[in-house]
C-alpha cells in the first residue's frame, strides 16, 4: 500500500503550482490512479469560517458541505473560537454545585474539558468529530499563538483524534503565506511546550478565579451579588485604585520658579524650584536691576533614530492617544486587517523582524507606494526619496534572536481596499511606522545658553553672589524619518501633557515641548538688561490612568519606564498577555469596578472597597502576578515545569482560602449598579 507520506508530498506539489489548474488536475488524476481503492483524506481545521474559506480556496477544497469544504483530497472545517472549555466545578462532583465555604478550596485531581453548551457549537463539533475520526492526517490551522493552540488541541482531544497531526504556522493570511505554510508544515509535537503553557494558564485561571470568587462572594458579598476575582483583573484593578488614592490623598504644595527674559528669550534658574517664598524673593531681589551676562553658548548636533515597529501594546497605546480607541477596539480592528490580509499577525509582543523578512520588504514598500485612499496616494511622497535604493538594515529592526513565534506588526504588501475609517487609521499607523524604520535618522541641532546675574558684595552678604540661568533650543536640520509623522492635533497634545507617565517612543528631541524652539544668536560675554519674574506654582498629583497608560503599566507590572530597551526587559514580568489585556479592562467595566470619565479610568466605590478588602498580596500584587507570567513564558520555552507551576498554584490557593476564612470581621461589600454616563440621556433626546 502506498504510504500516506507519499500522497501527502504529492499534494504539496499540487499546492506549489498555484493557479496552474491544468497541471493540478493532471497530477490529481495521476495520484488517484495509484490510490484507487482508498481515498486518503487530510482534514484541515481553522479557527473561524472566513479563515477556512481562504485555506480551502488555496488548496483546492472547493466543494461546500454542511460545516466543511472538500476537494483535492482535503476536507477543511472550522471552529468558532473556543468550542471546548475546562469543566465547571459541578462537573467534577455534585458537592461543588452549590456555593459553600465548606467546599473550598475546589481542587480537582485531574482537570477535564467539555463542549460549551451551545446548539451551534454542538452541531459543528459533531461534524468535526466525524471528519477527524475518518482522517489519515490532520492539519492544525488554528491561530498561530498560545490561545489558538489551546483551542484546536482541546477540540482534537474531545474528538479523540488518533491520526498524525501537522501544524500550519504562518504570520499573515496572504495567499503566498498560506502556500508557503503548507509547503513547510511543522510537526505538532514541536508546539507541545506552547500548548502546555496555554493549558497551565487556563488551569491557573480556573483555580484562582473559581476559588477566590466564591470565597470572597460568600465571605464578604451580600444580596447574592458576585465579587469577581481574577489572576490578572484584580492586580489591574489595584493599579487603578492605588493611583486614585494617590490623587485623592495628594495635598498641593506651593513652590516658586525664578526666571528672566533676556532678548525676548526666557531663561530659567538652574537651581530649580524654591520651596520657600522668602528664599525665592531674596533671590529675585538679588538679581533685580543687575545686568544679565551670557557665560556659555554650546551647540551640538545629534541624531534621533526612528521609533521601533509596533507590537500589539504599543499599537493600542498610540490608537488610544491619537484616536481615543479602546484597547479592545484596536485589537478588533488590527485583527480584521490581519484577516483581510493587509497586516501581519497582531497578537505579538516583539518589535523586531526576523532576518528572513528583509528580502520581502522592498515588495511591501512598492505596494505601499501604490496604495491609494480616496484617490490619494498618502505614502508615495514618503517612499520616493528611498526608491531604487537598497533598504537600510538595522539591528533595531531586524534581529532574529528577538523574534520567537511571530515578528512585529507590519503591512503584508497586499494593497488595502474598502477599509472603514477606523481600519484606515490603524493601517495608516502601521504603514507609516514600517516606512519610517527605513528612512534616515532625524538630524537636529541643540543650543544651550547659560547666563548669570551677579550681585556685588554687601554688608549683609560679604561675598559676591551669582545666580545662573539656562535656555535650551532645538532646531531640526533634516527631518529624516519624521516626515512620516502627521502633525499632532491640539487635543492629542493636551492628552500628552495630562499623562506624562506614558511614553511609547520617547527621545531627547521630544521630551520637552518648550525646547522645540530656535534661539536667537547669543555670544559669550554679551550683557544687557533683563526682566526677572518670580512665579508661584502648585505641585500637581499624578495623572489618572487612561487606557494607554494602563496598558503600559500592565506591560511593565506597574513600573513606568521610558527607555525602550529597559521596557523590553520589563515585558518579561508584565501582567497578562498582549492579546488578553484589552478583555481584562473590559471585564473591569462589566463588573462595575471601574468607569470612564472622558479618557480617564476611575475606580467605582465597589472597586475601591474590594481592593481595600483583599489582604493577600498574591491576589492584587502586580509584581507577583508578573512573576507568574514569567513562569508561564518559561514553560513555553521549556525552562520551567508545568506540573510544578500548577502544584505551586494549588498550594497558594489553599493558603488564600485558609487566611480569608480566619478573618474574624463581618465586613460586607455591595456591588453598586453602574452609574449613568453624564450627557447620555441628552444625546439620545437630540437624536
Question: What are the roles of these predicted feature ranges?
Answer:
Residues 9, 15-17, 27:
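Short hydrophobic targeting helices and cationic amphipathic motifs
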